[in-house]
């Protein structure tokens, strides 16, 4: 199992978020303030340090947490490629906001004024992403080590457990809040899974994501990461599209590779791209609709 093409190709929102998180963590780390970014009852309800709500969403409190956190954020870029940057932006906002709200409610219930009860970092987004990871990403390889069964997904779970236990209860609580937020998104509360930002908002992240870094197109097709799509799915996608016009532009190998890396049949991906005039997002929607029939 892998996360598709290497780098942040077709994942500009993830790229912007990872860079922002790294910069904030390094900035506060240099100042020696990273360990003070965690949320506490005193900060929020007595001193009204509302700015900590925002900073705690991006900056990790230690180097080990930063390493495991960025690794997981980087891997979960696969979901942006699956649903598109616009909907993934909604997922980030929803999971982060709901998780943060749950953390504030937790602080108000515990009323512990002695220390920072909750560690900082994008725990909401990371652990919300484990919901689609568990439900949508199939196991492609299984193996045994000293009689214990493992799969290719085990490494992601182990990284998540390490991050969850990195600060004991200070990190466990934010992780649980993230899992709850991801579950609510999965349940499509208030139709959130259909929500989209205006296009200019989604494209804003693309302009922030420093195109010169990590956006090179993949040189060759990648392995299927979301399960093998049956040939029937490919044929359904082909039948669902009218014959392309003679003047249609031949799909680029880069676009075909991107769709194949998302788990679609190569022939179906090519037909969808022809119909969508080489628009990867539109082709993805066509293929998803074909699968639902």
Curated annotation (Swiss-Prot):
- Membrane topology note: Multi-pass membrane protein
Question: Which purpose does this protein serve, as stated in its record?
Answer: Probable rhomboid-type serine protease that catalyzes intramembrane proteolysis.
Q: InterPro entries, from UniProt?
A: Peptidase_S54_rhomboid_dom, Rhomboid-like_sf, UBA, UBA-like_sf
Q: Which family does it belong to?
A: Belongs to the peptidase S54 family.
What name is this protein filed under?
A: Rhomboid-like protein 20
Please name the gene that encodes this protein.
RBL20
Entry's localization field: Membrane
- The highest taxon in the source lineage is Eukaryota
């Amino acid at each position: 199992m892998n996360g598709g093409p290497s780098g942040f190709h077709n994942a500009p929102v993830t790229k912007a978020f990872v860079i922002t998180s790294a910069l904030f963590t390094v900035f506060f780390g240099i100042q020696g303030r990273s360990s003070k970014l965690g949320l506490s009852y005193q900060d929020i309800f007595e001193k009204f340090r509302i700015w900590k709500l925002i900073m705690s969403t991006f900056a990790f409190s230690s180097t080990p947490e930063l390493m495991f956190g960025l690794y997981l954020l980087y891997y979960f870029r696969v979901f942006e490629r699956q649903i598109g940057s616009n909907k993934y932006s909604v997922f980030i906002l929803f999971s982060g906001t709901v998780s943060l709200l749950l953390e504030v409610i937790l602080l108000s219930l515990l009323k512990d004024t002695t220390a920072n009860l909750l560690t900082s970092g994008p725990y909401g987004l990371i652990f919300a992403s484990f919901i689609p990871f568990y439900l949508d990403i199939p196991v492609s390889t299984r193996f045994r080590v000293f009689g214990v069964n493992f799969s290719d997904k085990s490494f992601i779970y182990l990284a998540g457990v390490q991050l969850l236990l990195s600060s004991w209860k200070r990190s466990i609580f934010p992780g649980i809040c993230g899992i709850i937020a991801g579950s609510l998104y999965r349940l499509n509360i208030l139709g959130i899974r259909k929500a989209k930002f205006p296009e200019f908002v989604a494209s804003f992240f693309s302009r922030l994501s420093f195109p010169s870094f990590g956006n090179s197109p993949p040189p060759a097709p990648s392995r299927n990461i979301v399960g093998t799509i049956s040939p029937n799915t490919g044929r359904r996608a082909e039948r669902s599209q009218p014959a392309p016009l003679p003047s249609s532009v031949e799909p680029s190998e880069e676009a075909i590779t991107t769709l194949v890396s998302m788990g679609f049949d190569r022939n179906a991906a090519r037909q969808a791209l022809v119909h969508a005039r080489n628009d990867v997002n539109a082709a993805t929607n066509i293929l998803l609709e074909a699968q639902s029939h």
